[in-house]
């Protein structure tokens, strides 16, 4: 048994075994991280997911689960998709603004070149 229980074991009010699947990813000093993931996915499901993954990919999977769970808590309807949609909208607006600015620059350059040509005639 670990002398310091991980956040998951503290939250679940159980002993933290040496081979606890949660302890490397849910440190005791960040209990909200596990609480959020548990609220959305459940401890059993997260445990099963982690056990099915190779050790080298578990940390990334936990970070992804935490991010997705936080998004789902913040926006229960859309979750991460809401953020993706917002970013796509911002990209589209920025692309439109860039195209407009480039067109204005082209018009200004054309006027400037016409002014220089008329000055020489």
UniProtKB/Swiss-Prot annotation:
Record-linked PANTHER family: LOB DOMAIN-CONTAINING PROTEIN 23-RELATED, LOB DOMAIN-CONTAINING PROTEIN 4-RELATED
Organism listed in the record: Arabidopsis thaliana
Boundaries of every LOB domain copy: 4-105
Pfam families found in the cross-reference section: LOB
Record's protein name: LOB domain-containing protein 23
Taxonomy, superkingdom: Eukaryota
Alphabetized InterPro entries for the sequence: LOB
Transmembrane segments: none
Protein family per UniProt: Belongs to the LOB domain-containing protein family.
